[in-house]
């Protein structure tokens, strides 16, 4: 007994010194969910923006007080809020796994929602819960309703593909001999009666867009074969000695020859019309020409005489080419020798006498050989004495 009490004493001491509180019980969870649902507009709803943080904290403290009324330990408002956040997060994660678990052969047992989770779905609303809001039966019903929608889309695609295949087989002679053309016969592989009903209801609407290409494509296929056979049957019976025409596009050759002949006839008619028009035009001109002013005998007035040629210009003697002689510069210095003016270059200007008879001039003295060019200065003019080196201008 002493040992048992001694063993129990340390355990009680450990329990009293234990800091971690026990998990929330079922009753505590029920109180938490009920109180959060009652105060949800103040905590998370539209009114939460107008509620201060202190007021929300007081709401959580009041919820914790109600939970502490049924337990021997005390929980704070922060612990209660954390428990609600964890509860909500786990429920959302479980809801996110629902579509993946319902795609198999049957519903998974571990994903069945409890009453608490269903209540949380109702609190959070359809925006968060999605198709699983409400009870578990509604969840399974929503999952079952999502499957027929997907199956309906696949069934419609299947019916369209089968209808196209049926139309192709109907064009072939093997299909025309025997076979059912009803869409129900192609829908037999489906084992779901609901899908069969939906396919029967949607098959007329699906047949309309499919029949259009069949009606558009069916005439070209059977149309080309009959003309060659008809020509082949008529060609031997024709009494014409010409050999049978080749079966490759006979109608095109006939149409081409016919069009060519029509074109030639049209050209001939146009040429005849042009000839008639020209003949009528010539007759009209021949009738109108005599009425024009002019001699009646002449069909056309004579051409006007050409203008007279211009009078010939007087012939002038050829003018001698004008040669300009550069005048030699003559220095101003001149001397008077025996009544005659002698220039620097030796030109003698004889003075006229009073009677107008020129006087004989004596021969001019010979000029020195070392005479400088006329453009150079003579010694008689004073020049500036240059000293030093020449400076560039």
Curated annotation (Swiss-Prot):
<feature type="region of interest" description="Disordered">
    <location>
        <begin position="125"/>
        <end position="254"/>
    </location>
</feature>
<dbReference type="GO" id="GO:0042802">
    <property type="term" value="F:identical protein binding"/>
</dbReference>
<dbReference type="GO" id="GO:0006357">
    <property type="term" value="P:regulation of transcription by RNA polymerase II"/>
</dbReference>
<keyword id="KW-0804">Transcription</keyword>
<feature type="compositionally biased region" description="Pro residues">
    <location>
        <begin position="238"/>
        <end position="247"/>
    </location>
</feature>
<keyword id="KW-0238">DNA-binding</keyword>
<feature type="compositionally biased region" description="Pro residues">
    <location>
        <begin position="219"/>
        <end position="229"/>
    </location>
</feature>
<dbReference type="GO" id="GO:0005634">
    <property type="term" value="C:nucleus"/>
</dbReference>
<dbReference type="GO" id="GO:0000122">
    <property type="term" value="P:negative regulation of transcription by RNA polymerase II"/>
</dbReference>
<feature type="region of interest" description="Disordered">
    <location>
        <begin position="290"/>
        <end position="323"/>
    </location>
</feature>
<feature type="compositionally biased region" description="Basic and acidic residues">
    <location>
        <begin position="160"/>
        <end position="171"/>
    </location>
</feature>
<comment type="function">
    <text>Transcriptional repressor; DNA-binding protein that specifically recognizes the core sequence 5'-YAAC[GT]G-3'. Dimerization with PFN1 reduces its DNA-binding capacity.</text>
</comment>
<feature type="domain" description="Myb-like">
    <location>
        <begin position="16"/>
        <end position="88"/>
    </location>
</feature>
<dbReference type="GO" id="GO:0001227">
    <property type="term" value="F:DNA-binding transcription repressor activity, RNA polymerase II-specific"/>
</dbReference>
<feature type="compositionally biased region" description="Basic residues">
    <location>
        <begin position="375"/>
        <end position="393"/>
    </location>
</feature>
<keyword id="KW-0678">Repressor</keyword>
<protein>
    <recommendedName>
        <fullName>Myb-related transcription factor, partner of profilin</fullName>
    </recommendedName>
</protein>
<feature type="compositionally biased region" description="Pro residues">
    <location>
        <begin position="296"/>
        <end position="320"/>
    </location>
</feature>
<feature type="compositionally biased region" description="Polar residues">
    <location>
        <begin position="173"/>
        <end position="184"/>
    </location>
</feature>
<feature type="compositionally biased region" description="Low complexity">
    <location>
        <begin position="142"/>
        <end position="157"/>
    </location>
</feature>
<keyword id="KW-0805">Transcription regulation</keyword>
<feature type="compositionally biased region" description="Low complexity">
    <location>
        <begin position="1"/>
        <end position="11"/>
    </location>
</feature>
<dbReference type="GO" id="GO:0000978">
    <property type="term" value="F:RNA polymerase II cis-regulatory region sequence-specific DNA binding"/>
</dbReference>
<feature type="region of interest" description="Disordered">
    <location>
        <begin position="1"/>
        <end position="21"/>
    </location>
</feature>
<dbReference type="InterPro" id="IPR052870">
    <property type="entry name" value="Myb-related_repressor"/>
</dbReference>
<feature type="compositionally biased region" description="Pro residues">
    <location>
        <begin position="359"/>
        <end position="368"/>
    </location>
</feature>
<keyword id="KW-0539">Nucleus</keyword>
<dbReference type="GO" id="GO:0003677">
    <property type="term" value="F:DNA binding"/>
</dbReference>
<dbReference type="InterPro" id="IPR001005">
    <property type="entry name" value="SANT/Myb"/>
</dbReference>
<dbReference type="Pfam" id="PF13873">
    <property type="entry name" value="Myb_DNA-bind_5"/>
</dbReference>
<dbReference type="GO" id="GO:0003700">
    <property type="term" value="F:DNA-binding transcription factor activity"/>
</dbReference>
<feature type="short sequence motif" description="Nuclear localization signal">
    <location>
        <begin position="87"/>
        <end position="90"/>
    </location>
</feature>
<feature type="short sequence motif" description="Nuclear localization signal">
    <location>
        <begin position="376"/>
        <end position="379"/>
    </location>
</feature>
<feature type="short sequence motif" description="Nuclear localization signal">
    <location>
        <begin position="384"/>
        <end position="387"/>
    </location>
</feature>
<feature type="region of interest" description="Disordered">
    <location>
        <begin position="348"/>
        <end position="393"/>
    </location>
</feature>
<comment type="subunit">
    <text>Interacts with PFN1. Homodimer and heterodimer with PFN1.</text>
</comment>
<dbReference type="InterPro" id="IPR028002">
    <property type="entry name" value="Myb_DNA-bind_5"/>
</dbReference>
